[in-house]
Structures are given as C-alpha cells and as structure tokens.
C-alpha cells in the first residue's frame, strides 16, 4: 500500500521532505561531534533527493501528457536548497551554490506555472493545505543564501528575498481560514515546515540587515508557527489514538 501511494504524484513529490529532514538532522549531529556519521547521512540524503528529482521529472514531466501541478512540486525541486543551508556539514560550498542556483531557477519557473494553472487545475480539498507551501521556497532560498554567502551576502538581494518570502507568507495567512474550514486533513502536515521555515528565515534576514524594528514580527511568526505545529501534532496524536482504539477495542 505504501509503495502504491508513493507512485502517486502528490506523495512522491512530498517524499522529498525525508532527505531534507535528513540533511537537517546531519547538521545537528555534526554539532554534537558525530562528524563521520553526519557527513555520511548528508551525502546519502543529497543523493536520495537528486534521485527523487530524476525519477519524478522522468515520470511526471517528460513522459506525462500534461503537467498536473501541485504546490508540493516546490518541495521536491526547491527543497534541494536544504543542501545549501546545511553544506557546512561537509564543507562543500560549491555543492551548496549549485543546489541553491538550481532551487532559484526552479522557483522562477514553477511560480508562473502555478499562476497559469490556478484555474484550469482545481486542487482537491484533501490537498488544499499544501497551499501553505507557497511561502516556503523563497524563505528557504533566503536562509540558505545567508548561510552560504555569510558576510559577503548582498544586502539588496537579502532584502528582495525577504520581501518575496513575506509576500507569500501573507498570501498563506489569507488562505489559512479556508484551509481550516475544510476540517481535519492528513495533509495538514504541509502547514508545519513552511511556517517554521519562514519564521526562521525572517529572523536570519532581519539580523543580517539590522532591521531591529521588525523583531516583533519575527516573534509573532515564530509563535504562530509553534501554535500550528502543536495543533497539527495534537490532531495526529488524537487521530492515531482513535484508530488504535478502533482496531483494538478493550
């Protein structure tokens, strides 16, 4: 069943969250002094992500009769920028920049496609929580650019990425009421990373630019992300518990 689900377009594109999370885990393991383990995990995660991009592109882009776009496409293609954010694990800035420019290019390609497809391809209700993903790409690009370039990052470009990420974040905030009115969905998990990532990127951006007058906004976005993550985790816990009780009645 799981393998059949993985063959479906929305699931296969979302599966890229696993190598992304693995690269992030590698960064934490590296901080704990587990250097060999973290580097091994990072390279395996990068190879898995590239493999998923190749399989998905071949099956759903090159061989498909038409493009069936969902927001989770950005998880797959732009999510590779996680390698840029965490390249310090393996000290490979070249790989980081290659991944970053790839993610930037795909962002510039995908967003116009999403705009064109917004009416011709209606997103099913079960996938509408993926709308939250719209704010993730430019936030991830912002955070990874600052981490990659360090003090050499161009201030105007940081500001541009910051404004773009916040613009899409505002769009997501406007869509949240429509998402929650649909009722509980398994795809609520799509609400977590984009909101956390945007709050994290905002903090990095305002720290780099010295925009201390926006600290309150950083705190507000972090608080909202915490509330959403807690709520989604609570929903999953209750749902899994209910299923367990149903299958194993006492």
Task: Enumerate the predicted regions with their spans.
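Alpha-helical transmembrane segments in multipass membrane proteins, preferentially the mid-helix core
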Residues: 52-59, 85-86, 109-118, 140-147, ...
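A generic transmembrane alpha-helix motif of multi-pass inner-membrane proteins
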Residues: 202-238
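Helix-coil boundary and interhelical linker segments in multi-pass alpha-helical membrane proteins
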Residues: 27-39, 85-97, 145-157, 205-216
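Juxtamembrane helix-loop boundaries in multi-pass membrane proteins
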Residues: 2-27, 42, 60-85, 100, ...
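Structural signature of hydrophobic alpha-helical transmembrane segments
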Residues: 34-50, 94-108, 155-166, 220-225
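Predominantly late transmembrane helices and immediately cytosolic-facing juxtamembrane segments
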Residues: 137, 166-174, 227-233
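Long, repeat-rich segments with strong aromatic
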Residues: 143-146, 150-183, 197, 204
